[in-house]
Amino acid sequence: MSCSDKVRLAHEFFRRVWSPPHDLDAIDELMTEDYRITTAGKVISGRRDFKAWVAAMQKTCVGATNEHLDVFANAAGNMIVSRFRTRGINNGMFGLPADGAPVSFTGIAIWRVENGRLAECWVERSAFELYNQLCRS
C-alpha cells in the first residue's frame, strides 16, 4: 500500500464514518479488529467499543461532518496525520443542554496503519475552545 493509498484510507474513513449517512459498518472494513483510539486521555479498544463511542459522539453532535484541512503520510508510510474540522449541531455535548446551536471545532488525528487498515489512533481536539463556545451560546 503506497503512501497515497494510506492518505486515501483516511479520507475514506472521514467520508464514510464521520459524514452522513455515518456508516458505522465501514469500521469493520477500514479498521483492524483490535483497533485502539486514545482521545481525551481515554483509550477505547476494539472495533465494537469504537463503534459505540462514535455512535455516542454522533448523538451529541448531530449531523456531524469532518473535513481534512491537511492530511499526509510519513516517509515510512506507516503513519497518517490529519488536521481536521468537525461541524455539527449541539445535542448535549459535554453534558451541556442540547440547544441546537451549530458547533465547529478542529483537531489532529495520528493513525498507525497495519496491513492496509487503520490500527491505532491518537486524537487531540480543541475541546476547551468548544466547551467555551457552548457555554456562551
Give the ranges of each region predicted by the language model.
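C-terminal and inter-domain tail/linker signature
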Residues: 1-137
